[in-house]
Swiss-Prot record:
Record Pfam families: ParA
GN (gene name): CFD1
Its job: Component of the cytosolic iron-sulfur (Fe/S) protein assembly (CIA) machinery. Required for maturation of extramitochondrial Fe-S proteins. The NBP35-CFD1 heterotetramer forms a Fe-S scaffold complex, mediating the de novo assembly of an Fe-S cluster and its transfer to target apoproteins. Required for biogenesis and export of both ribosomal subunits, which may reflect a role in assembly of the Fe/S clusters in RLI1, a protein which performs rRNA processing and ribosome export.
Cofactor note: Binds 4 [4Fe-4S] clusters per heterotetramer. Contains two stable clusters in the N-termini of NBP35 and two labile, bridging clusters between subunits of the NBP35-CFD1 heterotetramer.
Molecular functions per Gene Ontology: 4 iron, 4 sulfur cluster binding; ATP binding; ATP-dependent FeS chaperone activity; metal ion binding
PANTHER family membership: CYTOSOLIC FE-S CLUSTER ASSEMBLY FACTOR NUBP2, NUCLEOTIDE-BINDING PROTEIN NBP35 YEAST -RELATED
Chain sites annotated for binding [4Fe-4S] cluster: 202, 205
Name of this protein: Cytosolic Fe-S cluster assembly factor CFD1
Main location: cytoplasm
């Protein structure tokens, strides 16, 4: 980190993080946390050191996704120590979430904007991530206080950009447009659009059926001339993996590497990492 960057206010906690990626969506219920989880799992399986920061303060679901609901974070001299996700293959994976700080996982978080902003500032400045290749930030839906706060806190950290998540339906893409416009206003680079829930994979015959429409994400990317990253189907086996890691004490990282979704995400992220994604109008 240069002296100029320190002067501009780069948080000490971020100085050893090579890349920062946000996962955004203007619409709730599109599977954003699922995309965050699978992005982190895929990067970890590729051998990277990965951190995941959950700033969905009123709905912190990632501890459940990673099978870490009963874990706690601890305070050290440099800040909170994130919870490590167990793995016997690939790189390293750590998670920080407000869910670890609640006395009861069922407690509701009823905070006004200033308290949310203060919590996000603390997450950015007071977590001891150590040396990371990637920090993935999971955000709540919309363009609310959390988004404004994270944009302000990252203004000197130069994040690589945002992955925008939508589902195929027009009611979803209409709200996701607002998120794309938000990124443009705060100068977040858009790494691309993912169309999630694009088809349903039958657990019996593995046939993919379009239970919703298809192509909404591609049309959205084309309209804004931003990269289109690909389609992610609904695969019941991913839910089974989450439940299996909890019931059988197996690592989600190790379970995920043999799933069909890992193949899909691996291809998407290879294109992102290699800078080979194309805009929607180029495909």
């Amino acid at each position: 980190m240069s002296a100029e960057t320190e002067l501009l206010g780069m948080p000490e906690s971020l100085k050893d993080i090579k890349h920062i990626i946000l996962v955004l969506s203007g619409k709730g219920g599109v599977g954003k946390s699922s995309v965050t989880t699978q992005t982190a799992l895929t990067l970890c399986l590729k051998g990277y050191k990965v951190g995941v920061l959950d700033i969905d303060l009123t709905g912190p679901s990632l501890p459940r996704m990673f099978g870490l609901e009963n874990k706690q974070v601890y305070q050290a001299s440099k800040g909170w120590i994130p919870v490590s996700v167990p793995t016997t293959s690939g790189g390293e994976l750590k998670l920080m979430s407000l869910g670890f700080l609640l006395d009861d996982r069922g407690n509701s978080v009823v905070w006004r904007g200033p308290k949310k902003s203060a919590m996000i500032k603390q997450f950015i400045k007071d977590v001891d991530w150590g040396d990371l290749d990637y920090l993935i930030i999971d955000t709540p839906p919309g363009t609310s206080d959390e988004h404004i706060s994270i944009a302000e806190e990252l203004r000197w950290a130069a994040p690589d950009g945002a992955i925008i998540v939508t589902t195929p339906q027009g009611v979803a893409t209409a709200d996701v447009r607002k998120e794309i416009n938000f990124c443009k206003k705060v100068n977040f680079n858009i790494l691309g659009v993912i169309e999630n829930m694009s088809g349903f994979i039958c657990p019996h015959c593995a046939e993919c059926t379009d239970i919703f429409s298809r192509g909404g994400g591609f049309k959205l990317a084309s309209e804004y001339n931003v990269p289109y990253l690909g389609n992610i189907p609904i695969d019941p086996t991913f839910v089974e993996l989450i439940e299996k890691q909890t019931g059988f004490k197996e690592s989600l990282v190790d379970l995920y590497k043999d799933s069909g979704l890992y193949v899909i995400f691996s291809k998407i992220l290879d294109n992102v990492l290699n800078g080979e994604v194309k805009s929607g109008t180029d495909q």
